């Protein structure tokens, strides 16, 4: 049996946490031969800690062969101690009458503290995925608050947008998602992100050629993917939790186990590719191998695409400047 991997999950008793933990413990994220120790963080309030205890009781009752241990805590330094993987799911949701900038600042406080705790106690090669929104900027804040860790250790989740786009293309083409490759999603995990199928193929044939409908792309596909989260809240009365948890599992599994040359989308600190300023946490097409991701380079960006990329970048820059004063 392999040595256990330590996985931290914040917001562990929340909706996404509940949809996530059982799948991690069953081996869906890191492999069916990889034991895990779950290190679970919840808010230091009685109700949250009681809920966390209940979730841990359920995890015990599953008797997962791969679950080698569990810790439940309200202290980030306990939750992040020696972790190999950290899923930062917990964030402050937007309350009634709350402006986006208030939301940014409330979350900046959380992710500054979590970045500092990771910096202090996590493994030096920890893989961090920020799921809690605004995910890109929260990941940027955590990264900036962990000066001793490699910035490449920090990522934001755009896999939900990627998977949503895959599913829309599959429905449009009447072809299974499994055959679709080379899809890209650029930018922020927000309605400004740009799902781009110009390079994508279904069973090896160009999707752009098969659809050949720029009107559908601009007025149906892009807005449907961008506003899917809102559509789910409208229908379900709750935000997408199971699909977000599924995307988090996909993101970490691919980062750790590799994509065998296939493109996936990750929010990563820019290296200057495609004119995105260095350090901006931006969605790019990537491939992964041996626990490292590589941005897919030198794709042609046409005027239509550039307009969308500029728009999502402008939003990220605005978010970044809104929290700059907190990061020194």
Curated annotation (Swiss-Prot):
A GO MF label: L-malate dehydrogenase (NAD+) activity
Q: Tell me which residues this entry annotates as catalytic.
A: 189 (proton acceptor)
**What's the Enzyme Commission number for this chain?**
1.1.1.37
Gene3D superfamilies under this entry? Lactate dehydrogenase/glycoside hydrolase, family 4, C-terminal (3.90.110.10), NAD(P)-binding Rossmann-like Domain (3.40.50.720)
Which residues are listed as membrane-spanning?
Answer: none
Give me any GO biological process, just one: tricarboxylic acid cycle
- EC supergroup of this enzyme: oxidoreductase
Q: Which reaction does it catalyse?
A: (S)-malate + NAD(+) = oxaloacetate + NADH + H(+)
Identify the InterPro entries for this entry: L-lactate/malate_DH (IPR001557), Lactate/malate_DH_C (IPR022383), Lactate/malate_DH_N (IPR001236), Lactate_DH/Glyco_Ohase_4_C (IPR015955), Malate_DH_type2 (IPR010945), NAD(P)-bd_dom_sf (IPR036291)
CDD domains on file: MDH_chloroplast-like (cd01338)
Which residues are substrate-binding? 94, 100, 133, 164
What the entry lists under Pfam families is as follows: Ldh_1_C, Ldh_1_N
- Give the domain of life: Bacteria
Q: For binding NAD(+), which residues are annotated in this chain's numbering?
A: 11-17, 107, 114, 131-133
Kindly give the HAMAP family that the UniProt entry links to this protein: Malate_dehydrog_2 (MF_01517)
Described function:
Catalyzes the reversible oxidation of malate to oxaloacetate.
Q: Which family does it belong to?
A: Belongs to the LDH/MDH superfamily. MDH type 2 family.
Recorded protein name is Malate dehydrogenase
């Amino acid at each position: 049996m392999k040595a256990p991997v330590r996985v931290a999950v914040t917001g562990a008793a929340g909706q996404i946490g509940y949809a996530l933990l059982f799948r991690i413990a069953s081996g869906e994220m890191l492999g069916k031969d990889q034991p895990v120790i779950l290190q679970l963080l919840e808010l230091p309030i009685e109700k949250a800690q009681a809920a966390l205890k209940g979730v841990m009781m359920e995890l015990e009752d599953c008797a997962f062969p791969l679950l080698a241990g569990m810790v439940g805590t309200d202290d980030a330094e306990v939750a992040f101690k020696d972790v190999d993987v950290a899923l930062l799911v917990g964030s402050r949701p937007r309350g009634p009458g709350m402006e986006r900038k208030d939301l940014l600042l409330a979350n900046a406080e959380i992710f500054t503290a979590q970045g500092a705790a990771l910096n202090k106690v996590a493994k030096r090669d920890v893989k961090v995925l920020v799921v809690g929104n605004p995910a890109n900027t929260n990941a940027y804040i955590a990264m900036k608050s962990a000066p001793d860790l490699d910035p490449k250790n920090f990522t934001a989740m755009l896999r939900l947008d990627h998977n949503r786009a895959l599913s829309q293309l599959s429905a449009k083409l009447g072809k299974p998602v499994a055959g679709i490759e080379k899809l890209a999603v650029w930018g922020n995990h927000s309605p400004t992100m740009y799902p781009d199928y110009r390079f994508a193929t279904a069973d090896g044939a160009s999707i752009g050629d098969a659809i050949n409908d720029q009107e559908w792309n601009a007025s149906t596909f892009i807005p449907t993917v961008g506003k899917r989260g809102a559509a789910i809240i409208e229908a379900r009365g709750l935000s997408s939790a199971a699909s977000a948890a599924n995307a988090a599992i996909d993101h970490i599994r691919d980062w750790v186990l590799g994509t065998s040359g296939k493109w996936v989308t990750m929010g990563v600190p820019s290296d200057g590719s495609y004119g995105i300023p260095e350090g901006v946490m931006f969605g790019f097409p990537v491939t992964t191998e041996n626990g490292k991701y590589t941005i897919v380079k030198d794709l042609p960006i046409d005027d239509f695409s550039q307009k969308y990329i500029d728009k999502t970048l402008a939003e990220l820059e605005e978010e970044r400047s809104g929290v700059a004063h907190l990061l020194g």
